Amino acid sequence: MASDDRPLALTLGDPSGIGPEIALAAWRLRGERGVPPFQLIGDPEFLEATAYRLGLSVPVAEVEPDDAVEVFARALPVLPLPSGAKVSATPGAPDSANAGAIVESITAAVDLVRSGAASAVVTNPIAKFVLTRVGFAHPGHTEFLAALAAREGREPPLPVMMLWSELLAVVPVTIHVALRRVPDLLTQELVERTARIVHADLRARFGLEAPRLVLSGLNPHAGESGTMGTEDRDVLAPAVAALRAEGIDIRGPLPADTLFHERARATYDVALAPTHDQALIPIKTLAFDEGVNVTLGLPFVRTSPDHGTAFDIAGKGVAKPDSLIAALRLAQRLAQRPANNVTPFPVRA
């Protein structure tokens, strides 16, 4: 299959969360919202039951990978889990009995992309505690995908999480760690490696010839010359200097409290921030329903909706599919970009 003809591989996510219902909703809106063809990897009977319970007139078809695009016009294509495992879940009641199916769906999606049967991976939300209860060894989705991407006997690539929207794109340098651990983890090497990956993928995947990056400070006022913490002066500033010496357009460290207003956003393409919440709070404020999680540094395209499992509203029929639809559309654009040479990035000011 040509790249433009291949479907996206959508994972099951946690079946007790909103993933299954937003997948059904995305399929229903395929014409109205320009949703590209995708196949969901899971249990067809479970998806049928979910549609029935929610009162959604969504036909579900069990498919082989080669059939997904043709079927997508008339039914939601569901590729059974390779093991044939069945899924049973109660909305809002996460169950570690489904951990195996959740992990198998992710692994199968990566296998489809690596074999050429799918163009990109789009992941539905998972709950880490459901998986860690049964011995899952990875901090989250992103790190597990990096492990799957590693070639036999080689170190996994450094995965970089970018949250993308039409208004703002951000990268947290440290991800799912306690805030008190950040100063020890925030090394000059980590900042430089992260920025290099962002720069390289913005050029290769997003089509930006000269990406403009900024780096937020860690401390108030970016440390104010060391009077409010030394990390900005001793770690972040040397990293920026080293990156600029390599020809990467990056500024910082800059005070975080003035980095995300409209005029500031017009001066850069991506903002890197030392901590998870420094990066995610502004994008979720600006684009809560439209943000997309994009993993950079992998040998394949992976996107995800920028929200969690939402167990509190699962099964109530109120979950919005907007972020999933944005993730599906961006994944297709990134997978096709080398062929159509159209950048998925917002028009720069």
UniProtKB/Swiss-Prot annotation:
Q: Name one Pfam family in it.
A: PdxA
Q: Name one GO cellular component term.
A: cytoplasm
The keyword RNA-binding belongs to this UniProt entry's keyword annotation:
no
User: Which subcellular locations apply to this protein?
Assistant: Cytoplasm
Identify the metabolic or biological route this protein is part of.
Cofactor biosynthesis; pyridoxine 5'-phosphate biosynthesis; pyridoxine 5'-phosphate from D-erythrose 4-phosphate: step 4/5
Q: What EC number(s) is this enzyme filed under?
A: 1.1.1.262
Gene Ontology molecular functions? 4-hydroxythreonine-4-phosphate dehydrogenase activity; cobalt ion binding; magnesium ion binding; NAD binding; zinc ion binding
Q: Which UniProt keywords apply?
A: Cobalt, Cytoplasm, Magnesium, Metal-binding, NAD, NADP, Oxidoreductase, Pyridoxine biosynthesis, Zinc
Cofactor binding, note field: Binds 1 divalent metal cation per subunit. Can use ions such as Zn(2+), Mg(2+) or Co(2+).
The biological processes this protein is annotated with in GO are: pyridoxal phosphate biosynthetic process; pyridoxine biosynthetic process
Its recorded reaction(s) are: 4-(phosphooxy)-L-threonine + NAD(+) = 3-amino-2-oxopropyl phosphate + CO2 + NADH
What's the cofactor?
Answer: Zn(2+); Mg(2+); Co(2+)
Give me the residues that bind a divalent metal cation, please: 176, 221, 276
Listed binding positions for substrate are 141-142, 284, 293, 302
Summary of subunit composition and partner proteins? Homodimer.
Entry's family note: Belongs to the PdxA family.
Further remarks about this protein from its record:
The active site is located at the dimer interface.
Q: Its function? A: Catalyzes the NAD(P)-dependent oxidation of 4-(phosphooxy)-L-threonine (HTP) into 2-amino-3-oxo-4-(phosphooxy)butyric acid which spontaneously decarboxylates to form 3-amino-2-oxopropyl phosphate (AHAP).
Protein name, UniProt field: 4-hydroxythreonine-4-phosphate dehydrogenase
